UniProtKB/Swiss-Prot annotation:
It comes from Pyrococcus abyssi (strain GE5 / Orsay). NCBIfam families: PRK00317.1-3 (NF001457). Belongs to the MobA family. Its EC number is 2.7.7.77. It is an enzyme of class 2 (transferase). Mg(2+) binds at D92. It catalyses: Mo-molybdopterin + GTP + H(+) = Mo-molybdopterin guanine dinucleotide + diphosphate. GTP binds at L6, A7, G8, K18, D67, D92. It is found in: Cytoplasm. It comes from the Archaea. GO terms for molecular function: GTP binding; metal ion binding; molybdenum cofactor guanylyltransferase activity. The gene is mobA. This is Probable molybdenum cofactor guanylyltransferase.
C-alpha cells in the first residue's frame, strides 16, 4: 500500500505554505511523512503536490505526483490513485498514529471494498485518513467531470465503502486526525 501525502492546498488560513513551515527545525510535511513511514503496511510514501510547490516538494527526495487540477482534496486523492491503492492523509497531520493507520489498512484489505473511511456517529467522515482502492478513481473522475468537488459526497455516493466507527476505537487514536490549519494550531505540537 502506498502512503499518499496531500500537499497541494492553498494554506489560506495559515498565511504561508504551511507544509514547508519548520516545527522543531523540520518542515511540517516531514513530520507527517515520518509518522506514515512508521506504518508497517505502508511500503512507499508519495507526495501529491501542486504545480506551484512541486519543486520545493521534490527537494525532500520522495516521489512527487503533481495534481494539475488542485480543486481540493478530491483531486489530490484522484492524482494519488494513479499510482495504485493508497492510504491518503493531509500533509498537515503531524500527529498521525501508525497503529491506527495499520488498523484501517487491515480492515480495507480484509473487506475487499472500494474504500475504508473512519466515520463519527454524527455521520461526519475523515476522508484524509482513509484507504482507497485504485478503482475508486473512476468514481472520482465522474464526480469531478460533473463539477461535484466534495470528497465526502463522493465517498457517500459509493455503495461498497467500509466505514470504521470512531467511537468504538481507543480514545487516544483520535489525536491522529489532528491537522494544522492556523498558526495557533502549532501550540498543540510545539512543546
Ligand atoms: N494535492 C492537493 N492537496 C490539497 C488540495 N487541497 C488541499 N490539499 C491538502 O489537503 C490537506 C488539507 O487541506 P486544508 O487543511 O484545507 O489545506 P489548505 O487548502 O492548504 O488550507 P486552507 O486554504 O486554509 O483551507 C493539506 O495538506 C493540503 O495541502 C488540492 O487541491 N490538491
Ligand atoms: Mg486542514
Amino acid at each position: 500500500m502506498i502512503g499518499a501525502v496531500l500537499a497541494g492546498g492553498k494554506s489560506r488560513r495559515f498565511g504561508e505554505d504551511k507544509l514547508l513551515f519548520e516545527i522543531n527545525g523540520k518542515p511540517l510535511v516531514l513530520h507527517t511523512i515520518e509518522r506514515l513511514e512508521g506504518c508497517s503496511s505502508i511500503k512507499k510514501v508519495i507526495i501529491v503536490a501542486s504545480p506551484q510547490n512541486r519543486e520545493a516538494m521534490e527537494e525532500f527526495g520522495y516521489e512527487v505526483v503533481v495534481d494539475d487540477l488542485t480543486i481540493g482534496p478530491i483531486s489530490g486523492v484522484y492524482s494519488a490513485l494513479s499510482l495504485g491503492d493508497a492510504f491518503v492523509v493531509g500533509g498537515d497531520m503531524p500527529s498521525l498514529i501508525p497503529e491506527f493507520i495499520d488498523y484501517i489498512i487491515k480492515q480495507f484489505n480484509n473487506s475487499g471494498k472500494i474504500a475504508c473511511v473512519p466515520r463519527w456517529s454524527n455521520g461526519y467522515l475523515e476522508p484524509l485518513h482513509a484507504a482507497y482502492s485504485k478503482n475508486f478513481r473512476d468514481i472520482l473522475e465522474e464526480r469531478i467531470e460533473k463539477g461535484l468537488y466534495k470528497l465526502g459526497d463522493a465517498i457517500s455516493s459509493a455503495k461498497n465503502v467500509c466505514y470504521i466507527k470512531i467511537e468504538d476505537l481507543p480514545l487516544g487514536w483520535r489525536e491522529s486526525f489532528f491537522n494544522v490549519n492556523k498558526k495557533e494550531d502549532l501550540h498543540r505540537i510545539m512543546q
